Structures are given as C-alpha cells and as structure tokens.
Amino acid sequence: MKEAERKRKILYHQHLTSRCDAQTAARDVLALQAQFLRHAQMSLRLRTRDDSWKQWVKQSVKTRAFRGTLHLLDAEDRLLITSALWKDYEHRKYYMARYYTPQEEQLFCNAILDLLQQGICGRRKIYTRLVAMGLDEKLCELACSSWDGLFAVLNIQGKVMFQHAASREFAYAPISLRSDLDACRKELVYRYLKGYGPVTLRDASYFFGWKKKELEAVLQKIHNVQMSDCNGSTVYELPEEIDAYPRIPTAVFLSGFDPLML
C-alpha cells in the first residue's frame, strides 16, 4: 500500500473528507479528547455537515477514557468503553495510588460517593465535608485536587461522570460494567480499525495504552482483518467496497488533541 492511499483512507474514515451527522462522526472516532472543550467541539465541527454537533455536545458524556484522559463520548458508548478500559486500572496503576493505601483509597472513595448521592457535588464542599469527618487533611486535598484526584478513579470505574461537557463537577452515575472483557475489547478494537484504519500496531498501542502483544492477540480474534505493507510497516484495516477515496486536501486545520493526531 502506498502512503498516499493510506492517507486517503484514514481521512475518509475520520470523516475529514466524508462529513456526516455529529453522532456518526463522534462514534466512528470513538471519543473526542476534551481537556479543553473548545478543542473537542472543533474536532467534531470539522467532521459534521450541519450544526448537529451542538446538540451532540450537550448530550455527550464527559468522562475519563482512553489513556485515562478526559473525553467526550456518545452516551450509547459509555458502557462499552468503560467496560473495556477500567481493568487497566484495577491494580492501582494510576498516579493517585502512590498516596493512598488500598484501605485509605476505599474509605475516601466510599465517602465521596456518599456525598455525591446527597447532592453535594462541589469539590470544595466535598473537601470540607471530608475534613469534618476527621480524615487526613492532606489526603482530603489530594482526593479533591484540580486534576480530579480520586474522582478520576471513580470516573474510570464507571461510578461517576461529569455533570455535562463544560462542567468540572461530578455526578453519581454508576453503571453495571460488562463482565465479558475480551468481547468488549474485541468490539472496541474492531471499531477502532473502522474509524482509524489503516493503522500500525504502534498507532493502536498508543491510542489504547495497551502493549503491542495485547493488541496482536485481540486482532487475531477479529474476522477478516487485512494486513498490508506500507513503507516497511505492517498496517491493519477492515475490508470495504469503495472504488475510490476522496483526494487529499491541500490543508486540513485540526484542533488540539484531534483524533487524527492521536
């Protein structure tokens, strides 16, 4: 496969040369990285043919997803994405784990969930309540830090989510995670190939935050994955019946953290 052909396919699958409605675009790229809301909005606007992106953003779910970072994703995909990814953090493989023992973490998380269920959502208010419970003040501060602290852990576990796309406060919103981890990962990688292919193992490894061997094992379970050589690298894609892909634009001005760059 020539590099130009690969680029045409990727731009088409990313809806940068095949604009569509907002929900289709958002689901095909799986999620929009949202450290800055305006970047996620611009990424979606580039891929939509109308103003449907505005309503989609209002109805989207803001949560931590791929690589543990903030994303906007379609409400229909929250269960699949969270179920496929939360296991990556099950063994306390995140930065907050260095500050808390497992027992302390559980104590703080339970206290935060109780307060959220009472409708106390502001970080400062939750911090004040935790301190009033007699908990260690430094750990209370870390739990409610501007980097989301233990809220990030609860977010990744599917127990809380942000109140809306522009919010920095969380809401109690638990979901019953699927137990079929392998099936979830297979479905997610299949959709990744559909929206990002042709991809290299290195591309996929960065996107998911998984080791290449893990991804190879998942790819082997997906029916009809096609492999080609492109500039000395193996690329993976799904078969499709398209005679010709749109030409590569002279320039495409992307937002920060655009899915194409990730």
Locate predicted features.
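Short, cationic-aromatic polyanion-contact patches
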Residues: 74-78, 166-183, 234-244
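Non-catalytic regulatory appendages
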Residues: 214, 225-262
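A short, conserved structural fragment
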Residues: 57-70, 155-165, 223-230
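Loop-centered beta-sheet repeat module
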Residues: 140-216
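Phosphate-backbone binding and catalysis cores of DNA-processing enzymes
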Residues: 1-136
